[in-house]
A protein has these predicted regions:
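N-terminal secretory signal peptides that target proteins for export/translocation
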Residues: 1-11
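Proline/Glycine/Serine-rich low-complexity intrinsically disordered segments
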Residues: 33-291
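Sec/Tat signal peptide C-region and signal peptidase I cleavage site
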Residues: 28-32
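Bacterial N-terminal signal peptides
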Residues: 12-26
Length: 291
């Protein structure tokens, strides 16, 4: 997936932005009545990463885009918002450089060249880590993994609470995707029913043409809590993580020469994970959880 965001995972094209906001706000309201979902720890709580000296830093400009909700987008008031935007601000606060921090939005296609040309210092926009990008840039440690999940039609009785309960049921998946390959590798005995698009897959699930589906947890989480699902379905089993199929996770991209800044960002991410601030931001945008 050269020079792309985690394209198969973005909500763009999955449903409209208005529907995304509706799902988000309804999720926020409902989450107050639910136990808080946990964010898996990606940093060892015992690990203490050194905090580099940033006293000579003149500016830290984060670059992002506005087409990757709920990670980075403009809200209904035109304000730059999202998980990544809030995280960038928390990183600056943790490093005690908030007065030196800026966040600028550019078209996604321009981010790579802008970083290379020193028009910004770090890209926080959901770039997929690829060997090509690693030859030119460095990446922070991942701060969020996007898993795969099953979703089931609640009208279909299942004998169990794990994927084994789906053994006699058709499971939909989008043809030609990493999730189709992952389903075949992880669950070779399940009966996969391929569909050409996500819309076709979810329509079939809603209409009980398939009993379950296997796809990206981010998309499924917002769909099941949105009016589009008509409360037909729920997440089931999982999560399932695989670096081979799903990549290294969401990271921050920097220039190779900026090793001190990279170490500082890793220090901030580890601290935010340890003190619970990363979890707070996660719950703000994923109140139903991905895991």
């Amino acid at each position: 997936m050269m020079q792309s965001k985690l394209a198969s995972l973005t909500l763009k094209g999955f449903f409209t932005f208005g529907l995304f906001l509706g799902a988000l706000f309804s999720s926020l309201a409902a989450s107050a009545q639910q136990a808080s979902p946990s964010l898996p720890l990606l940093f060892d709580a015992r690990e203490r990463l050194a905090r580099p000296d940033l006293s000579s830093l003149v500016r830290l400009r984060f670059l992002t885009s506005v087409d990757f909700p709920p990670f980075n987008f403009t809200d209904q008031n035109g304000k730059l918002s999202g998980f990544n935007v809030d995280l960038a601000r928390e990183i600056c606060s943790e490093l005690e450089i908030s007065d030196k921090c800026q966040i600028q939005a550019l078209p996604f296609a321009d981010l790579r060249d802008a970083l290379a040309a020193s028009q910004g210092d770090a890209v926080i926009a959901g770039f997929a880590v690829t060997p090509e990008l690693r030859r030119q840039f460095v990446f922070s440690r991942p701060y969020l993994m996007l898993p795969a999940r099953f979703v089931r039609n609640l009208a279909v009785p299942l004998d169990g609470k794990t994927a084994a309960a789906l053994s006699s049921h058709p499971v939909g998946v989008v043809r030609g995707t990493v999730h189709e390959a992952m389903l075949a590798a992880f669950f070779p005995t399940l009966k996969a029913e391929p569909f050409d698009t996500k819309d076709a897959l979810l329509a079939a699930l809603k209409d009980r043409k398939v009993d379950a589906a296997f796809a990206d947890a981010l998309q499924l989480s917002f769909w099941v809590s949105s009016p589009a699902s008509a409360k037909c379905c729920a997440l089931f089993d999982g999560p399932y993580l695989s670096e081979h199929f799903l990549g290294e996770g969401i990271t921050i991209m920097l220039r190779q020469k900026d090793s001190v800044l990279t170490s500082a960002i890793d220090h901030a991410l580890a601290t935010l994970s340890r003190n619970g601030r990363l979890q707070e931001i996660y719950l703000r945008y994923f109140p139903y959880g991905l895991y």
